[in-house]
Amino acid sequence: MPYEINHLSYSSISSYLMCAAAWKFHYIDKIQTPTSPALVFGSAFHNTIEQWLGGKAESLTDAWSKEWQKQTEGQVIDWGTDIPEELFNKGIDMLTNQDILAEMQNTFFTHAEMPVIETKVELSIPAVPVPIIGYIDIITSDKVPGDFKTSSKSWTTDKALDETQPLFYLAAMNQMGFPVDGWRFRHYVFVKTKTPKLQVFEHVHNPGQIMWLFGMIQKVWK
């Protein structure tokens, strides 16, 4: 890479793999492109859950209102056929849904210790002179890392297994000396269908997959 940077983020690597041209526009040329409604919703929802789990918000709906306002102000959004008010109300519906609330309580607070939110990790890779950084959404008290997702439709087990992000987090945790018991990872998928729900996928990775991960990131760097 001919430009000077002092680190890579996992999100930038993921963006590059999806579309190199879009990555260049965003990270190198600094060209601002309209944000999608799905990204606005996901970011606001993600932040709301983290605020609540971190004890920084007494009410999920109050936190959602504040985060929605933050995400919708000061940036260009391509709403397309989506209606902002409907998306905002969908967030309220999800955060007041009794099944989702019960699942969150049973999933995040089943042990004596509180979950850890937004853990920064760094991964060093041979032939890549800068660290790869990322932030793990949640590490529950059983030491299993996890990631929050929002989706317009239900996930499948295969989709969860196809995600490369968990392998990066697990490799970074292992390198930094965190416990990685069984190389387990969880996805918490908040599905914004007519009847919303929370899906929890736990899957196991193989330490041997690290070499594939290293090779993939080395190719991105070159």
Which sequence ranges carry the predicted segments?
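An N-terminal structural lobe/cap that precedes and organizes the functional/catalytic core
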Residues: Y3-E4, L8, W23-K24
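Metal-dependent nuclease catalytic regions and adjoining charged, substrate-binding loops involved
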Residues: H7-L8, L95-I100, V128, D158-K159, ...
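Nuclease catalytic cores
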Residues: I13-A57
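Short, compositionally biased low-complexity segments
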Residues: S15-W23, K56-V76, D181-T193
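Short amphipathic alpha-helical segments and their helix-coil junctions
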Residues: A20-Q32, P145-S151, Q218-K222
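Hydrophobic (often cysteine-bearing) scaffold residues that line and stabilize catalytic clefts
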Residues: P37, F41, L87, D162-Q165
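A non-catalytic, helix-rich entry segment at domain boundaries
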Residues: T48-T119
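Non-catalytic protein-protein interaction segments used by genome-maintenance enzymes to assemble
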Residues: H111-M176
